[in-house]
A protein has these predicted regions:
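Basic, Lys/Arg-enriched alpha-helical interface segments
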Residues: 1-57, 67-71, 78-99
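Short, surface-exposed beta-strand/loop micro-motifs that present aromatic residues
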Residues: 60-64
Length: 99
């Protein structure tokens, strides 16, 4: 099983989602990651990858790996804010320090 951790930025983004079903769909994808099923992902550079969620406006969750077991969820967004979200995720990954 893969350990999945969330940054404060990601938690804030999730709390800001108004639609309960959207949160459920995203959480289901995160649970699949924890068992090794990443689905539709792609690298966006800077040791950051994008998890594409084919629901609503095309939600994205950005993550990085630390070692073999830990996935850090950096931030999220949708297709309309993709470029800005990628830059934010790269910055968070660069500044991330192990607690």
């Amino acid at each position: 099983m893969i350990t999945v951790r969330e940054t404060a930025d990601f938690e804030k983004w999730m709390r800001g989602l108004k639609d309960r079903k959207t949160r459920l769909v995203i959480n289901a994808r995160i649970r699949r990651i924890s068992v090794g099923n990443f689905g539709n992902t792609k690298s966006v550079g800077g040791n950051v990858s994008e998890l594409v969620i084919d629901y609503g406006p095309g939600y994205r969750v950005y993550f990085t790996r630390r070692g073999r077991e830990i996935i850090i969820l950096l931030c999220g967004g949708d297709k309309s804010s993709q470029s800005r979200d990628i830059e934010t995720a790269k910055q968070i990954a660069e500044n991330f320090k192990e607690a």
